[in-house]
Regions:
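A residue-level marker of the well-folded mature domains of exported/periplasmic proteins
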Residues: 1-175
Length: 175
């Protein structure tokens, strides 16, 4: 996110635009993101750049922004309602599928697999897992667990250790 913020500030300076950055401390804090989104809408900006932390929970608020003529740009994730004017994102289905195909080339027919994903319910995590399962093909049935680390390194480390203890025959942890 640091690179995105730096790039946004540079572009704002180049185009003589004013920006204000509002973000929750934790990526999975949907409630706080929605509070900040409401605050931003009340300030009446020309545009809002957002990476929605929920596929569903911000829809009504974003609809309000659209009704007020505020342009909406999504970064790397989106909501179930297509309210955005622009989306800049990774093709998460394709990325997940490529990882799944690579993983399948390393695994045997009975090898157990676990997934440590970033934030439950966010479109990027959903699509990456879907693509990964597709890439695995028949080996997708070997996925024994999916856990979420909320984009926190230490939590992902702890969850991975717990998975390895819970499934002693685990051959791969994908994330």
């Amino acid at each position: 996110w640091k690179a995105l913020i730096l790039g946004t500030r540079m572009a704002a300076q180049e185009y003589n635009a004013t920006i204000e950055i509002k973000a929750p401390t934790e990526e999975n804090d949907v409630e706080r993101q929605n509070e900040l989104l409401k605050e931003a809408i009340e300030e009446g900006p020309d545009a809002i750049l957002i990476s929605p932390s929920s596929f569903t929970e911000s829809n009504k608020i974003l609809d309000e922004a659209k009704e007020k003529g505020i342009r909406i740009s999504f970064i790397d994730s989106y909501t179930e309602e297509p309210v955005q004017d622009l989306t800049v994102a990774t093709n998460n289905l394709e990325a997940g599928e490529k990882l799944g195909k690579f993983a399948a080339s390393l695994l045997g027919p009975d090898d157990q697999i676990a997934i440590v994903a970033h934030v439950k319910g966010v479109s990027t995590a959903v699509e990456r897992e879907e693509g990964f399962r597709k890439g695995l093909g028949d080996l997708a049935d070997n996925i024994v667990d999916v856990v979420y680390c909320d984009s926190q390194y230490e939590k992902s480390r702890k969850l991975t250790i717990e998975l390895m203890e819970k499934y002693p025959n685990l051959k791969m942890v994908a994330g």
